């Protein structure tokens, strides 16, 4: 809608490292964006991938420091009612994990971090939404941008890395390398959120993104590891990490 076009314009004027809108045609809700040269971070390998994660974190830190556009909605994915609905859907589809899902939901809702400062969130942070070129990363796909705590974006990425390890796409060592590169680069540009907030939003993202999408998008590997993913989220919430 028109708000998407206006939001892209405002985001592009507030941050230099996002895709630039060229034209918005309201009758057809058509938004034309500038072509972004480079490679999606998801397509990089080895050391280039590590550097891509660092660049993505730096771009995200700059995005979080930008002025918040007036049209942005509030980030709601981790609201208690949304988390409860995720749990309900997961338990309905997979009664065998209902108990651990409900325990996670209760623990999340009883430990919601307070006093989190609000920033301009990307809202859909993953390696396909960053284009790397000569050490710099441009953020794309801004349609889920919202106002919320920085830990929501960071936790989403950490949850994805954890998911990729748990289903066997990457090793535990590689998960930690990429997570460290991501967080260290962010910290080099902007103060990291408190560890408690980061752990909470990582656990919330494992529930509301990784576990839920395994169910409603029928992802076989996620479904196979669903019980472990939910247990991992509880462990991350309690201790900040998972032993392996």
Name these PLM-found stretches:
Residues 1, 33, 42-44, 72-73, ...:
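Extended hydrophobic-aromatic, low-complexity segments
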Residues 1-27, 44-62:
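A conserved alpha-helical element in kinase catalytic cores
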Residues 2-4, 28, 95-99, 137, ...:
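Regulatory N- and C-terminal appendages and interdomain linkers associated
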Residues 23, 34-35, 127, 131-132:
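Conserved hydrophobic "DFG−1" position in protein kinase catalytic cores
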Residues 27-49, 61-69, 83-94, 163, ...:
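A glycine-centered beta->alpha junction motif in the catalytic cores
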Residues 69-122, 188:
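An alpha-helical support segment within catalytic cores of ATP-dependent transferases
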Residues 108-152:
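Active-site acidic catalytic loop and adjacent metal/ATP-binding pocket
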Residues 151-190, 204-221:
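Active-site activation/catalytic loop segments of kinase-like enzymes and analogous catalytic loops
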